[in-house]
Amino acid sequence: MNLLRNLIRPYLYSRYSFHRMTGTGAFRGDRVRTIHTPVHPQWNPLKQAIWKYHVKQFHESSCSVASVVSCINAIRSLGNNDTHPISQADILDRVTTGHWKERMSEGGYRGRRGLPLPLLGQVVEDSLTAYELRVRSVDIVQTPKNQNGRSPVRAMLKKRLREFDRHGNGLIIAHFDQGSLVPTLNIPHISPVGAYDATSERVTMLDVDPEQLKPYQVSFDTFYKGLSCDYHHVFEAFGYGSGGYIYIQTQ
């Protein structure tokens, strides 16, 4: 597995360099807009909480930990304002699903690092259970590639984005190709959604990558492209097939 990882990196950097030189992919002009002012919507406690408890990952493969702990702390805060936030180390010690902690190590679990979409969903469910948090449902959604604009999967995602932004009745954790959204490597990545503007159809990402210093906004089409990207076949050996999202319906 280490040999395979070493072979993947040159390919990823060559693809990154190509997009940078040609101005394609996420290097196209006006594709990403940085959000400089934090969002504090008093009418939407859940949205306010996810912005407050959003944290950055502690190393290159731990985007799942930062994303899940951000959501768990946001949900916990709604029931008890005095709740002390859970740390990323705490949740890794408490939730052992899928050898989560081992997957965050340098060598990974049997050479596998990070969490594919189905395993991310299991980790979210077990994290909610571990901290005795009741939600209506947890939905693991794969986003098929080459869907037309009227596909039910796209329509449902837009509906859930609107519901989150207007009413705060659910959180969305995206599992996406990061290089489709921002100028970086085309690798599987995980981060929570922070907002959705239904008028402009733009999605705000609370990216847990510490290199993304501020939240950023992309069009819904760009967001969906990142979700529906079939990860390069070299990632299949590590369990990564395609992207999608986890929807935590809280009410």
PLM segments and residue spans:
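Cysteine-nucleophile protease catalytic domains, especially the papain-like/related folds used
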Residues: 17, 27-152, 239-242
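Conserved active-site-adjacent core of cysteine acyl-enzyme catalytic domains
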Residues: 95-188, 194-227, 231, 235-243
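Polar/charged alpha-helical tracts
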Residues: 2, 6, 89-93, 155
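Short amphipathic alpha-helical patches
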Residues: 70, 77, 229-232, 247
